[in-house]
Amino acid sequence: MSEQGESGAMIGAEMTVDISQHLLETMRAAYRRQRMLAERALAQLLPADWHVRLDPESNSVAIIVRHMAGNMHSRWTDFLVSDGEKPERDRDGEFRPGEQTPEALTEEWDDAWDVTLATIDALEPDDLLRVVTVRGKPLSVAEALLRQLDHYGQHVGQIIFLAKHLRGASWSSLSISTPPRDG
């Protein structure tokens, strides 16, 4: 019996797509899920929350958003034909506190996600075993997809943690609400 997985691909004994196509569809859905979770957390922030740092060594939500956007532009622009670490990227600058408004950061974020998802959506199953380079290191496209999904998941988790911390009692759960705690 077959059923539809979270990505929309058929799974089970009568699988109608090959494993490469299934992996691509699953990865596309996972990237979109990371974006959605981050955006649901970002939507709960007040403008002043974006630049709060828990301590001098911590990143604010604004820094994390700027870093993710810089990483996405670098990794996904000309993904199949150029190194994923572009010379014009100012990675160190992504981690300097700035004064960008939430609107400007959201525009940068949306643009970066547009590049990312357009690139991933354009991939074909045969591309998964092609070799790309990131910081001079050869990786299969499948490895690069998984590596970036892991990286983004870490930062999305940071965004969610910070947003939940900053919003306190006004936080709206992104999934199943936790039961009230005693004491």
Regions found by a protein language model. Name each.
Residues 2-6, 10, 14, 24, ...:
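Short, contiguous alpha-helical
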